[in-house]
C-alpha cells in the first residue's frame, strides 16, 4: 500500500505533513502564507490562510494536469467560391462549439488563471470515429445537424473540422491562491473554513470533488467544477442557509454537516450524483443545551463533534439514508477539534497539550473506536523564513487567548529598539520552542490590553543577533513600519481557544517566550528539537490507515548514542542480504563437510516410503456429476540417490464396489485452487485431463486444509521435476480470471518446428500474489497490474500467499492487497398497469441476476468471490456501464437478450441497472508496489537491456488513458525512477513496445497508432502516426514482437499486420488470422500465444484457454495452426521473456498437424470447472 500523508498546521501558521510510513513531520512550502485551517484529500489540499483567502496545494506528479480546449470551424459550399466561410443566416457560427449554438473563436480562449499555461498552439484533429481523415481534417455532411463522414460526396454541402489546444496546470507543490466570488456589486466575503470531499458521489467527470467553504459572515459557498482536469474549479456559488455558519465538514459521500453560531448543527440533505449541492437544510440540536456545538467532522457513516466545553461526541445511526443520525454519545477526552479521515479513522488536536491524536480501534463494526493515542514524532529541521511578529498574533486569532510576557523574565524587553531582522529571527526561534500549558478558558472575561501582546526579548550581543538575522531570508531585505507597542490590540476575531503558556511546564530558566533571547544559534537549535510543537488543525482526508497498517507515529527512538544511530543508518538491506547469504554458505559448507565423511557407508534402507492420508470430497466423472466423500493417500518414495516420486490415490465407492484412481505427480501439469463460498476445492490437471478440459477436483472441509494439501502436492511435484528457486528470465507467466499467478519454464525446443510435444504437457507452478495481468521480458524484469490498477514489480522471490516456510523464499516476499468490484443486475419489465416493475413474465430472467440472467444474485445472497475476500463498501448503483445509463442508472432494451442503451424509447419494454460492491483481498507474494499512478496496461521491451546498467524500454497506459514511458528501468533497478508523459489527443487503452523499440498503441475509440523515432536517446519518440484499423472494427489490444504486430478487436478477432519493414515500420494492410481470441502475446522471437474462448473439450466448450501458434518462422510469421494448452479460466499470458532459439529446420507442410481454430458456436459459452470467468 503506498504511503499517504496527514496534514496539520501549528500555531504559527506553518503547514506540515506526516507520512504513514514516516516518523517525522515534514514542512510544507508555505511561501509567505500562514494558514489557519487545511482540508486534504489524496491528490491535493485546500487551505484557509490567515488573510482569510483560499489556497490550493496540488501534489507534483509525473502525470501532468491537461485540459483540452476545442472549437469547430464550419464552412458551406456555394457555386462561386466553393467551400468558404460565407454561411447562410440560419446557419451556425463560423467558429462554434460542437452543437453550433455558442460562438467560439480561437482568440476567445483565455487561460482561466495565472496557474495555467498553454502546452501548444492550435492544431487540427485529423481523426473521426477512430479513422484518419484526409489532410486538413475536414469532415463532410449534407447539412450541419447531419452525420459527418470523412469522405466527400456529391451532396456534401457543408463541412467542418475540429481545432484542439491543450493547457497545463503549472502550480504544483506550491500554494495557489483561489479567487473569491467575482461579483463586483458585493464586497469580498472573507473565508473562515473550508472542507473537501464528495469524491465517492460520482466519478464523472474523473476526480470530481465537492469543495465547500464558510465565510466570516456565516455564508456557505460551493466551488463549481472541481475535478482532475480543473483542480481549482471555476467559480463560487452561494447557498442560502437558515442561520450563520461558523464551521463546515463534508465526507467522501453525501454527508455534509455545519456548526452554527447558535450552537446547533445543520445537515445538508438531497446530495446525490445529479445534485451534488443538495436541496435543503435540517437542524440537529446540540448534545447539551448549555454547551453548543462549535466543531463537527463527518466521514462515510460517522459524525464527530466538539462542544464549547471541549467535550467530544459521537453521532450514532448516521448513513446515506439517514444523514441526521439518531443520537449523541459522549466520548472520553477533551479536544480542540477532530477530523474524520479515510475509512472513518479519526484524528484530533488535544485541548490542553495541543498534540495531534489518533483514535485507535476504529473498525467498520466499531466506528467509535477505543482510545486516543498521541502522535509523538518530531518535526523536521525546517527553518522558517516567512514568520513575522504578526505570526503569533495571527495564530492567536484562532483561539482567543494570548501569549503573555513572563512576570519574572530575567532580561528586560528591548523590542522597541530592535530592528526587523532581529525581531524576525527571534520570532523564528519562538515558533518551534513554545511549550504547551494548562488551558484556562477565557470566554467570560475580556482580554486585557497587556495580555494581547507577545513580548519578545533579545540578547544584547551583536554577534548573536547578526547570526540569527542571516536565517530570516527575505525579511531582512525589507524594512517594516514601527512595531506596535505593548497594549495595542493585535486582533479582533475569535475562533477557537489557544493554550496559555504555563510556567510550571517549563524546565529550568526556559520559562516563556522571552527567555529565547539568551540562546546562541546552536543552543537554540538543540532546544527546539526537545520542545513539543503546538498544533491548531489536523486533516486526515488524504491519509489512509488500515486496521492492519503498522504505524511508527507513537514511539520515539531514544537512548541511542550518535555513533550507534550512525551505525544503524549505515546498515542497508543489501548488507543484511549479504550477511544472510554468507551465513547460509558457511552452514552449507559445514553440513557438506560433516556428511562427506560418512558417504562410503552402505545405506541401511534402500528406499523409504512416506504416506499422508486424509478425507476429502471428489467431483466424480460420471453422471450425474456430484461431490462424493473419498479417502486420499499421498505416497512419496525416496530412492537411494535422493530422487523422490509421489503417487496420489483417491479411494471411492461405486455402488457397493470399492475402487480407486491414482495420479503420478510427475505427470501433473498444474494444481489450481478453486476457492468459493460453497467449496474449498482445487483442481489437478494432467496432459490427458487438459485435453478433456475436465480436471480432477477435490474439496476439503476448511480453507486451511485445502491450502495444506495444495502445498504438500505442489512440493511433491517440484521434487519430482527437480524444480526449486525463483523462475528464470525465460519463464512464461500467466494469470487466471481469479487473479492467481502461474509460471512455466519453457523447454529449449518449445518453439521448434520439429517439436512433437504439445503445450498441454507444460508444468505450471503458482507464485504468490493477486494480479490482473503480468508482463515479462528476457532481462528478468517483470511487472504486474492488480484489479485496482496498482502496479507491482517482481522482486525475484517465489512462493508467498498460502505457501509457507520451505515452500517459499524467505526474502523478497511482501504484503499485497487488491480490490475489485462484484456486479449484480436489477431487472424490470414494463406493464400497462404499474409501468416498470419487478414483476416479469414466467420466461423472464431473475429480477436480480448476474449479467447473463441465468443465475439469481440478490444483494443478500451475493458473497465475495472467495473466503479470502472481504467487503469494503456497501452496494451502490454503477453508472459506468457500456452503452450509458439514464440519471437513475437504468439501461433500456426491447427485450432482455437485446442490446441496451441509456435512454428510453417507445419500443423499450425492459430495463436493467447494475449494482456494484467493492471487496478486498490481503495476501503476500514476491511483489513490490510501484506508486503512485494507477495503470490500465503495461508493456516491456522483450529484448533490450542486456547489460545490468542498460536501460529497458517500458511503456504504460494510466487508468485515465494517458500514455507513459518509464525511465530508469534496468536489471538492477527493475522499478525504474520516474514516468515521462507522452502527449496524445485522446485516451488510450493498450500499448506494446517491440524488440526494436517499435511502439504501437490502441486508442479508446479503437484506432491504432505507431510512435515514431523511439530510441534509447529519445525514449518517448517524437510523434504519433495514425494507422487505419481493419474495416469497421474497433481494436482493443496490441502486441508487438521482433518483426510482427498482432491486434485483437472487440469482437475477438485476431489480426496480423503485413508489410512491416525497417524502412516502413507502420506496415501496409491487416489480415484476419483467427476468431474467439481474448488476449495475444507476441514474444521476442515473434512467438504467438493467445488466450482463446470456445475451445472444445470432452464435456463442454472451454473459455479462457492458453493456445500456442505452431509453425512460426522468420519467413512465415503467421504460423499454420493452433496447439491448445492449459485452460479454461485463464485471463492473461505473456511470453515476452522466452528467447529460447527455435530450430531453423522447416517442417514439410504435408506433415504439419493442422488443428482448427477455436470453434465459433451458436450455443452458449460454457466455462471450465476451474473458474467462472
Curated annotation (Swiss-Prot):
Residues 409-422 have a biased composition (Low complexity). GO terms for molecular function: phosphatidylinositol-3-phosphate binding. Residues 403-489, 1147-1173 are annotated as: Disordered. InterPro entries: Beta-propeller_rpt_TECPR, Peroxin/Ferlin, PH-like_dom_sf, PH_domain, TECPR1-like_DysF, Tectonin_beta-propeller. Residues 424-434 have a biased composition (Polar residues). GO terms for cellular component: autophagosome membrane; cytoplasmic vesicle; lysosomal membrane. Residues 609-718 form the PH domain. Pfam families: Hyd_WA, Pex24p, Tectonin. Signal peptide: none annotated. TECPR repeats lie at residues 209-240, 254-285, 301-332, 344-376, 730-757, 952-983, 997-1028, 1043-1074, 1086-1126. The keyword DNA-binding does not apply. One of its GO terms (biological process) is autophagy. Keywords: Autophagy, Cytoplasmic vesicle, Lipid-binding, Lysosome, Membrane, Repeat. It is found in: Cytoplasmic vesicle, Autophagosome membrane; Lysosome membrane. Tethering factor involved in autophagy. Involved in autophagosome maturation by promoting the autophagosome fusion with lysosomes. Binds phosphatidylinositol-3-phosphate (PtdIns(3)P) present at the surface of autophagosomes. The PH domain mediates the binding to phosphatidylinositol-3-phosphate (PtdIns(3)P). Belongs to the TECPR1 family. This is Tectonin beta-propeller repeat-containing protein 1. It comes from Xenopus tropicalis. The lineage of its organism: Eukaryota, Metazoa, Chordata, Craniata, Vertebrata. The gene is tecpr1.
Amino acid at each position: 500500500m503506498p504511503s499517504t500523508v496527514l496534514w496539520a498546521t501549528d500555531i504559527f501558521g506553518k503547514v506540515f505533513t506526516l507520512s504513514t510510513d514516516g516518523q517525522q513531520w515534514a514542512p510544507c512550502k508555505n511561501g509567505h502564507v500562514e494558514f489557519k485551517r487545511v482540508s486534504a484529500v489524496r491528490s491535493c489540499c485546500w487551505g484557509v490562510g490567515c488573510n482569510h483567502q483560499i489556497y490550493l496545494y496540488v501534489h507534483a506528479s509525473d502525470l501532468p494536469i491537461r485540459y483540452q480546449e476545442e472549437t469547430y470551424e464550419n464552412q458551406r459550399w456555394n457555386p462561386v467560391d466553393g467551400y468558404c466561410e460565407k454561411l447562410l443566416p440560419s446557419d451556425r457560427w463560423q467558429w462554434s462549439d460542437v452543437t453550433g449554438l455558442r460562438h467560439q473563436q480561437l482568440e476567445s480562449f483565455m487561460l482561466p488563471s495565472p496557474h495555467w499555461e498553454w502546452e501548444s498552439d492550435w492544431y487540427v484533429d485529423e481523426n473521426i470515429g477512430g479513422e484518419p481523415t484526409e489532410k486538413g481534417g475536414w469532415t463532410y455532411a449534407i447539412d450541419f445537424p447531419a452525420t459527418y463522414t470523412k469522405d466527400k460526396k456529391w451532396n456534401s454541402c457543408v463541412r467542418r473540422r475540429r481545432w484542439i489546444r491543450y493547457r497545463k496546470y503549472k502550480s504544483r507543490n506550491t500554494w495557489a491562491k483561489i479567487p473569491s466570488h467575482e461579483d463586483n456589486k458585493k464586497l469580498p466575503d472573507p473565508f473562515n473554513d473550508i472542507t473537501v470531499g464528495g469524491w465517492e458521489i460520482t466519478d464523472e467527470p474523473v476526480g470530481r470533488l465537492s469543495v465547500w467553504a464558510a465565510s466570516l459572515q456565516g455564508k456557505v459557498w460551493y466551488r463549481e467544477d472541481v475535478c482532475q482536469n480543473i483542480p481549482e474549479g471555476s467559480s463560487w456559488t452561494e447557498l442560502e442557509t437558515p442561520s450563520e455558519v461558523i464551521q463546515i465538514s463534508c465526507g467522501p459521500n453525501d454527508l455534509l454537516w455545519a456548526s452554527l453560531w447558535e450552537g446547533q448543527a445543520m445537515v445538508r440533505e438531497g446530495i446525490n450524483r445529479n445534485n451534488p449541492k443538495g436541496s435543503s437544510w435540517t437542524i440537529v440540536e446540540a448534545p447539551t443545551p448549555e454547551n453548543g456545538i462549535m466543531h463537527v467532522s463527518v466521514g462515510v457513516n460517522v459524525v464527530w463533534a466538539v462542544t464549547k466545553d471541549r467535550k467530544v461526541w459521537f453521532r450514532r445511526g448516521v448513513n446515506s439514508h439517514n444523514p441526521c443520525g439518531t443520537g449523541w454519545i459522549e466520548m472520553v477526552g477533551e479536544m480542540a477539534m477532530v477530523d474524520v479521515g479515510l475509512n472513518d479513522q479519526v484524528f484530533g488536536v488535544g485541548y490542553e497539550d495541543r498534540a495531534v491524536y489518533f483514535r485507535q480501534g476504529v473498525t467498520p463494526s466499531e466506528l467509535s473506536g477505543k482510545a486516543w493515542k498521541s502522535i509523538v514524532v518530531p518535526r523536521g529541521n525546517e527553518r522558517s523564513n516567512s514568520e513575522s511578529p504578526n505570526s503569533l498574533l495571527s495564530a492567536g486569532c484562532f483561539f482567543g487567548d494570548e501569549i503573555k510576557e513572563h512576570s519574572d523574565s530575567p532580561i528586560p524587553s528591548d523590542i522597541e529598539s530592535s530592528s526587523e531582522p532581529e525581531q524576525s529571527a527571534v520570532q523564528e526561534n519562538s515558533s518551534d520552542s513554545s511549550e504547551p500549558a494548562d488551558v484556562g478558558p477565557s470566554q467570560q472575561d475580556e482580554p486585557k490590553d497587556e495580555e494581547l501582546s507577545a513580548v519578545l526579548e533579545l540578547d544584547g550581543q551583536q554577534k548573536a543577533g547578526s547570526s540569527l538575522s542571516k536565517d530570516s531570508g527575505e525579511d531582512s531585505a525589507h524594512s517594516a513600519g514601527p512595531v506596535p507597542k505593548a497594549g495595542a490590540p493585535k486582533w479582533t476575531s475569535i475562533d477557537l481557544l489557544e493554550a496559555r503558556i504555563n510556567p510550571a511546564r517549563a524546565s529550568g530558566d526556559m520559562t516563556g517566550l522571552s527567555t529565547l533571547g539568551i540562546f546562541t544559534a546552536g543552543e537554540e537549535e538543540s532546544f527546539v528539537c526537545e520542545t513539543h510543537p503546538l498544533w491548531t488543525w489536523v486533516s486526515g482526508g488524504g491519509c489512509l490507515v488500515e486496521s492492519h497498517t503498522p504505524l511508527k507515529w507513537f514511539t520515539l527512538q531514544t537512548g541511542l548514542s550518535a555513533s550507534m544511530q550512525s551505525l544503524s543508518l549505515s546498515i542497508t538491506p543489501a548488507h543484511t542480504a549479504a550477511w544472510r547469504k554468507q551465513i547460509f554458505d558457511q552452514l552449507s559448507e559445514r553440513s557438506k563437510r560433516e556428511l562427506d565423511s560418512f558417504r562410503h557407508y552402505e545405506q541401511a534402507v534402500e528406499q523409504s516410503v512416506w504416506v499422508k492420508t486424509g478425507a476429502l470430497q471428489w467431483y466424480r466423472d460420471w453422471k450425474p456429476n456430484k461431490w462424493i466423500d473419498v479417502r486420499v493417500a499421498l505416497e512419496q518414495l525416496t530412492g537411494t540417490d535422493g530422487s523422490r516420486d509421489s503417487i496420489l490415490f483417491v479411494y471411492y465407492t461405486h455402488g457397493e464396489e470399492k475402487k480407486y484412481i491414482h495420479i503420478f505427480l510427475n505427470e501433473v501439469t498444474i494444481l489450481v485452487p478453486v476457492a468459493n463460498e460453497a467449496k474449498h476445492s482445487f483442481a489437478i490437471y494432467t496432459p490427458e485431463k487438459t485435453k478433456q478440459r475436465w480436471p480432477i477436483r477435490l474439496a476439503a472441509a476448511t480453507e486451511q486444509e485445502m491450502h495444506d494439501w495444495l502445498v504438500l502436492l505442489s512440493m511433491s511435484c517440484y521434487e519430482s521435476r527437480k524444480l526449486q528457486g525463483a523462475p528464470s528470465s525465460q519463464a512464461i507467466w500467466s494469470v487466471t480470471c481469479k487473479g492467481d499467478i502461474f509460471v512455466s519454464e519453457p523447454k529449449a525446443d518449445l518453439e521448434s518446428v520439429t517439436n512433437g510435444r504439445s503445450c498441454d504437457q507444460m508444468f505450471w507452478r503458482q507464485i504468490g500474489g493477486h494480479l490482473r495481468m503480468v508482463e515479462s521480458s528476457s532481462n528478468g524484469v517483470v511487472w504486474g497490474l492488480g484489479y485496482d490498477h496498482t502496479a507491482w514489480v517482481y522482486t525475484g522471490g517465489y512462493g508467498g500467499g498460502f505457501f509457507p516456510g520451505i515452500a517459499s523464499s524467505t526474502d523478497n516476499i511482501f504484503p499485497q492487497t487488491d480490490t475489485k468490484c462484484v456486479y449484480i443486475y436489477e431487472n424490470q419489465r414494463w406493464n400497462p398497469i404499474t409501468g416498470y416493475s419487478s414483476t416479469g413474465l414466467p420466461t423472464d430472467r431473475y429480477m436480480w441476476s448476474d449479467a447473463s440472467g441465468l443465475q439469481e444474485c440478490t444483494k443478500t445472497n451475493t458473497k465475495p468471490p472467495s473466503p479470502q475476500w472481504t467487503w469494503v463498501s456497501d452496494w451502490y448503483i454503477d453508472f459506468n456501464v457500456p452503452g450509458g445509463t439514464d440519471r437513475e442508472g437504468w439501461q433500456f432494451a426491447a427485450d432482455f437478450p437485446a442490446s441496451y442503451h441509456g435512454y428510453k424509447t417507445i419500443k423499450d419494454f425492459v430495463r436493467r441497472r447494475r449494482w456494484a460492491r467493492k471487496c478486498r483481498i490481503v495476501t503476500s507474494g514476491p511483489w513490490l508496489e510501484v506508486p503512485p499512478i494507477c495503470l490500465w496496461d503495461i508493456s516491456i521491451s522483450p529484448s533490450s537491456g542486456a547489460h545490468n546498467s542498460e536501460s529497458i524500454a517500458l511503456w504504460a497506459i494510466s487508468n485515465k488513458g494517458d500514455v507513459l514511458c518509464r525511465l530508469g528501468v534496468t536489471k538492477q533497478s527493475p522499478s525504474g525512477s520516474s514516468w515521462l508523459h507522452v502527449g496524445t489527443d485522446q485516451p488510450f487503452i493498450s500499448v506494446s513496445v517491440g524488440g526494436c523499440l517499435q511502439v504501437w498503441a490502441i486508442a479508446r475509440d479503437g484506432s491504432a497508432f505507431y510512435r515514431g523515432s523511439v530510441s534509447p536517446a529519445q525514449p518517448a519518440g517524437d510523434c504519433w502516426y495514425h494507422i487505419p484499423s481493419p474495416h469497421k472494427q474497433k481494436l482493443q489490444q496490441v502486441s508487438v514482437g521482433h518483426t510482427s504486430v498482432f491486434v485483437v478487436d472487440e469482437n475477438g478477432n485476431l489480426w496480423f499486420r503485413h508489410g512491416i519493414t525497417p524502412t516502413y515500420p507502420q506496415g501496409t494492410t491487416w489480415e484476419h488470422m483467427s476468431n474467439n481470441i481474448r488476449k495475444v502475446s507476441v514474444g521476442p522471437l515473434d512467438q504467438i500465444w493467445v488466450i482463446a474462448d470456445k475451445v472444445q473439450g470432452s464435456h463442454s466448450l472451454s473459455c479462457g484457454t492458453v493456445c500456442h501458434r505452431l509453425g512460426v518462422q522468420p519467413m512465415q510469421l503467421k504460423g499454420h495452426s493452433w496447439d491448445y494448452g492449459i485452460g479454461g479460466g485463464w485471463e492473461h499470458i505473456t511470453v515476452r521473456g522466452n528467447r529460447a532459439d527455435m530450430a531453423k529446420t522447416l517442417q514439410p507442410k504435408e506433415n504439419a498437424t493442422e488443428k482448427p481454430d477455436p470453434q465459433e458456436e451458436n450455443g452458449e459459452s460454457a466455462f471450465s470447472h476451474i473458474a467462472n470467468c
